[in-house]
Design a protein with these regions (language model features):
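Non-catalytic cap/lid and distal C-terminal segments of serine-dependent acyl enzymes
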Residues: 1-163
């Protein structure tokens, strides 16, 4: 049986950061039937308002949520990307025989928030670890900035992303 390890990266990063800094992980993974999955933080090149204007919003800061603001909702659906699109590609195309594989998720910073939420909300993962997570994004500047753009004013943030 293969084991799936999803590494959810933090603010300002891309799907390449872990791969560049943790090459030993891939050697260990290949010896232990472990599949390392490195989803990106956000869509790239979507052309949404301000998505490349700041380091703490947009590209590099998708927060692994599904945006509801019409300016972002077409592209910023990172929760669905990981739990539906990416998972379907993994199971249907790359590893169709591994439907029962164990899945772990780990995240850092913004990715820690993503890991916790993906674990608690989706029920796809059997274990979760979060290192220095942005655990309460509506009460920190990075989360407030992102959520106000992805969802609108704070009273419009869906409770599924704040609880």
């Amino acid at each position: 049986m293969l084991l799936f390890f999803f590494f959810i990266i933090g603010l300002t990063c891309t799907d390449e950061n872990f791969a560049q800094k943790a090459t030993i992980a891939f050697q260990t993974a290949s010896l232990n039937n472990l599949i390392i999955v490195l989803p990106d933080t956000s869509p790239r090149g979507a052309g949404c308002p301000d998505d490349t204007a700041a380091w703490d919003f947009g590209e590099g800061a998708g927060f692994y949520i599904n945006a509801t603001n019409p300016s972002y909702s077409k592209h910023y659906n990172m929760y669905d990307y990981i739990t539906i699109e990416l998972w379907d590609i993994l199971l249907q195309t790359l590893f169709p025989q591994q439907l029962t594989g164990k899945r772990s998720i780990f995240g850092h910073s913004m990715g820690g928030f993503g890991a916790l939420h993906l674990f608690l909300k989706s029920q796809l993962f059997t274990s979760c670890s979060a290192f220095a997570p942005i655990a309460d994004p509506v009460n920190c500047p990075w989360g407030q900035k992102a959520f106000s753009k992805y969802f609108g004013p704070q009273d419009q943030v869906p409770t599924e992303w704040t609880n």
